């Protein structure tokens, strides 16, 4: 089976400082993987390279492939990267919604990568696309807010709109960059349950960067830990130990990042039951 994501020898330098160092990673179709690590470890940088939103170094920069297609190699993006991004849903930490638009219009933006530019620029979405967007909103529990302006939503609701947009996009790979970093515990739980259900029910490959190890253990079978731009651990999330995490984050890191006994005993099963889009 071809890997959903394949990274080989990836290097990225910012102002003579290495952000990613000879990084190699392979993720199989249908996996849900947590990228963990302290701030500045390279998590978000790696995710942006997977989506073709950033370029690796031109000299020995390495290669990134998604769904068997080259996204970039040695500092050059694939000329068809826009078409490739149609299969990659990207969920940003700060929601990345257009506040003046309605919830529905924000979700319909997910259709743009698979439609002619002229139709997208005019906002001419057909009935099937609108129905798909409404089904996606229903999945995340926001169908009744479709006509509401995005700016009026809470942070948790806005993040769920971003997930609905990725569903409408029909992305095969979903990359979520710190999707719960600014959310309250209940909103964070709901967002992670939705992502986990999309992974399990639809078989989508989901890669999520997390600062909260508790959530990585609870929802992601596999964890990849980065430190100084290198992979420091790659294995079962439940095997992460407190001594290892002390080394990864530093002994003085906030205790909320550590694994609770409940998380270690059993990964919580999602409570939401979602229909496929």
Curated annotation (Swiss-Prot):
Positions that bind ATP: 37-44
Membrane topology reported for the UniProt record: Peripheral membrane protein
Origin: domain of life: Bacteria
Gene3D superfamilies: P-loop containing nucleotide triphosphate hydrolases
GO molecular function: ABC-type phosphonate transporter activity; ATP binding; ATP hydrolysis activity
E.C. number(s) listed in UniProt: 7.3.2.2
Domain ABC transporter, first and last residues per copy: 5-253
Major enzyme class: translocase
Described purpose of this protein according to its UniProt entry: Part of the ABC transporter complex PhnCDE involved in phosphonates import. Responsible for energy coupling to the transport system.
Quaternary structure and interacting proteins, as annotated: The complex is composed of two ATP-binding proteins (PhnC), two transmembrane proteins (PhnE) and a solute-binding protein (PhnD).
Family named by the database record: Belongs to the ABC transporter superfamily. Phosphonates importer (TC 3.A.1.9.1) family.
Name under which the protein is recorded: Phosphonates import ATP-binding protein PhnC 2
Annotated source species: Pseudomonas syringae pv. tomato (strain ATCC BAA-871 / DC3000)
Gene behind this protein: phnC2
């Amino acid at each position: 089976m071809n890997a959903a994501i394949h990274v080989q020898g990836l290097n990225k330098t910012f102002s003579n400082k290495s952000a990613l160092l000879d990084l190699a990673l392979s993720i199989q179709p249908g996996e849900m993987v947590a990228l963990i690590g302290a701030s500045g470890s390279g998590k978000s940088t790696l995710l942006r390279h997977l989506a073709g939103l950033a370029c690796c170094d031109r000299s020995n920069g390495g290669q990134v492939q998604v769904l068997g297609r080259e996204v970039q190699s040695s500092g050059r993006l694939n000329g068809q990267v826009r078409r490739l991004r149609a299969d990659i849903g990207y969920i940003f930490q700060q929601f990345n919604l257009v506040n003046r638009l309605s919830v529905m219009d924000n979700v319909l933006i997910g259709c743009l990568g698979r439609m002619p530019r002229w139709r997208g620029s005019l906002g001419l979405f057909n009935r099937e696309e609108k129905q798909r967007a409404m089904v996606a909103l229903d999945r995340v529990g926001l169908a009744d807010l479709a006509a509401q302006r995005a700016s009026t939503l809470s942070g948790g609701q806005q993040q769920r709109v971003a997930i609905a947009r990725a569903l409408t996009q029909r992305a095969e790979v979903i990359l979520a960059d710190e999707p719960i970093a600014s959310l309250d515990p209940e909103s964070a739980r709901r967002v992670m349950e939705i992502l986990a259900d999309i992974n399990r029910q639809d078989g989508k490959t989901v890669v999520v960067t997390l600062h909260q190890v508790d959530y990585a253990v609870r929802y992601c079978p596999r964890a990849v830990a980065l430190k100084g731009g290198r992979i420091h651990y790659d294995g079962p999330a439940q095997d992460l130990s407190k001594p290892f995490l002390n080394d990864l984050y530093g002994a003085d890191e906030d205790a909320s990042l550590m694994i609770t006994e409940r998380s270690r005993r059993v990964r919580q099963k999602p409570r939401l039951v979602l229909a496929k889009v």
